[in-house]
């Protein structure tokens, strides 16, 4: 799977205050609109709740044949036999996650500095941002210049994340990205299908999808 990874429209999904039914409907509509990969990110759920929700999201992703990743929690990814995991710089090292998950699973890594490219052994793609201020990352912005440098030097695909919407995609034109990751642009949209469809159109218009 990692050799044919479509990162073009990457959804980071958090249930938040939505009902489970509404959450799963949002994800299904987003997939129908063009989402190519889903990462389940649940910081507020305990392990059992995360696992139970993960089972349902995994079933949905399997039915549409798109990859399903878990944020941070290698243990949950293992328990679910998810397609992979996305790690932050303070999570378990990628090489250890690779040892636990095996060669066929997808491992993504958050990255903000050029020098961190030295430590991406065993990683399939990079997530870089935030591109714009978000409620959780107001003080950790990544300049477009640095993002471009990381993309040019990275031997693996790079996904931009953080405050990305239709307008931001125009600003990313010319940068060698493999895709963009969104949260609120789809999860908070009135119509997840239309939001995803419009984002996908803008992605194809503006990104080379390296």
Swiss-Prot record:
Cleavable signal peptide: none
Cofactor: binding details: Binds 1 Mg(2+) ion per subunit.
GO terms of molecular function: magnesium ion binding; thiamine-phosphate diphosphorylase activity
EC number(s) recorded for this UniProt protein: 2.5.1.3
Binding site for Mg(2+): 72, 91
Cellular-component GO terms for this entry: cytoplasm
InterPro entries the record matches: Aldolase_TIM (IPR013785), ThiamineP_synth_sf (IPR036206), ThiamineP_synth_TenI (IPR022998), TMP_synthase (IPR034291)
Positions of disulphide bridges: none
Binding site for 4-amino-2-methyl-5-(diphosphooxymethyl)pyrimidine: 39-43, 71, 110, 137
Reactions accelerated catalytically: 2-[(2R,5Z)-2-carboxy-4-methylthiazol-5(2H)-ylidene]ethyl phosphate + 4-amino-2-methyl-5-(diphosphooxymethyl)pyrimidine + 2 H(+) = thiamine phosphate + CO2 + diphosphate; 2-(2-carboxy-4-methylthiazol-5-yl)ethyl phosphate + 4-amino-2-methyl-5-(diphosphooxymethyl)pyrimidine + 2 H(+) = thiamine phosphate + CO2 + diphosphate; 4-methyl-5-(2-phosphooxyethyl)-thiazole + 4-amino-2-methyl-5-(diphosphooxymethyl)pyrimidine + H(+) = thiamine phosphate + diphosphate
Keywords: Magnesium, Metal-binding, Thiamine biosynthesis, Transferase
Top EC category: transferase
Gene Ontology terms describing biological process: thiamine biosynthetic process; thiamine diphosphate biosynthetic process
Pfam annotation, one family: TMP-TENI
Cofactor or coenzyme needed: Mg(2+)
Annotated positions binding 2-[(2R,5Z)-2-carboxy-4-methylthiazol-5(2H)-ylidene]ethyl phosphate: 134-136, 163
Pathway(s): Cofactor biosynthesis; thiamine diphosphate biosynthesis; thiamine phosphate from 4-amino-2-methyl-5-diphosphomethylpyrimidine and 4-methyl-5-(2-phosphoethyl)-thiazole: step 1/1
UniProt cross-references to SUPFAM superfamilies, sorted A to Z: Thiamin phosphate synthase
Role noted for this protein: Condenses 4-methyl-5-(beta-hydroxyethyl)thiazole monophosphate (THZ-P) and 2-methyl-4-amino-5-hydroxymethyl pyrimidine pyrophosphate (HMP-PP) to form thiamine monophosphate (TMP).
Family under the similarity heading: Belongs to the thiamine-phosphate synthase family.
Name of the protein described by the UniProt record: Thiamine-phosphate synthase
